[in-house]
Amino acid sequence: MMKLKVYADRMSQPSRAVIIFCKVNGIQFDEVLISLAKRQQLSPEFKDINPLGKVPAIVDGRLKLFESHAILIYLSSAFPSVADHWYPNDLSKRAKIHSVLDWHHTNLRRGAAGYVLNSVLGPALGLPLNPKAAAEAEQLLTKSLSTLETFWLKGNAKFLLGSNQPSIADLSLVCELMQLQVLDDKDRLRLLSTHKKVEQWIENTKKATMPHFDETHEILFKVKEGFQKRREMGTLSKPGLQSKI
């Protein structure tokens, strides 16, 4: 049987979630780099796998699948080595996980990714910085963090939905928030420091997926260091996007 192939760029939040999930659960796979900076996601070869030209994507036998949440659900169901807590057999628990994942797409992801892209990361991908779009994304991110703090992280549980073990939703959302690492430290702390439950939940998810979590995020940490050096040298524009709108 052919080994699973994962097409990914580790600078992509959902790509990292899929890679970490495979590593934590002992799923053997070949990782194929699709460089977003080089726009390889738009190549004819990759579009044969995902016509939408986005990472991550997988090929498992004859199956070609894209969209990270669909991939995580498929892997949870297809590989016996995956522990039940990632995507429980209990249908009510599954439905609640789906509710978090659906919320994520139009709330936390739009806010976090939009803010990082438009305030810092855009030029690395050939896109201009957009302060207006960044400010709008920051408003959504702030609202989403408050919703995480007060609704999705219930009681004293370590993970989403009152669970004491992580699900695919925890991994997906935490990988999203890790993208904030490329921000200036003061800016990142300004966004996160008032959300103590969120900060602890991020740490809980990291610990539950070590050492694979840090290993998969190494490229992000290197990019963070590069941005910080450029800030110190004065060659990188500061976000300067304190919420005043």
From Swiss-Prot:
Keywords attached to this entry: Detoxification, Nucleus, Oxidoreductase, Peroxidase, Peroxisome, Transferase
Alphabetized InterPro entries for the sequence: Glutathione-S-Trfase_C-like (IPR010987), Glutathione-S-Trfase_C_sf (IPR036282), Glutathione_S-Trfase_N (IPR004045), GST_C_Theta (IPR040077), GST_N_Theta (IPR040075), GSTT1/2/3 (IPR043377), Thioredoxin-like_sf (IPR036249)
Residues engaged in binding glutathione: S12, Q13, Q41, L42, K54, V55, E67, S68
Source superkingdom: Eukaryota
A family per Pfam: GST_N
Segments carrying motif Microbody targeting signal: 243-245
EC nos: 2.5.1.18
One GO BP: toxin catabolic process
A Gene Ontology term for the protein's cellular component: nucleus
Compartment annotation: Nucleus; Peroxisome
Catalytic activities: RX + glutathione = an S-substituted glutathione + a halide anion + H(+)
Gene Ontology molecular functions: glutathione transferase activity; peroxidase activity
Domain GST C-terminal: 90-233
Record flagged with keyword Nucleus: yes
Domain named GST N-terminal: residues: 2-83
Matches recorded under SUPFAM superfamilies: GST C-terminal domain-like, Thioredoxin-like
This protein's record includes keyword Metal-binding: no
Transmembrane segments: none
Predominant subcellular localization, coarse grouping: nucleus
Record function comment: In vitro, possesses glutathione S-transferase activity toward 1-chloro-2,4-dinitrobenzene (CDNB) and p-nitrobenzyl chloride (pNBC), and glutathione peroxidase activity toward cumene hydroperoxide and linoleic acid-13-hydroperoxide. May be involved in the conjugation of reduced glutathione to a wide number of exogenous and endogenous hydrophobic electrophiles and have a detoxification role against certain herbicides.
Assigned protein family: Belongs to the GST superfamily. Theta family.
Record protein name field: Glutathione S-transferase T1
Gene: GSTT1
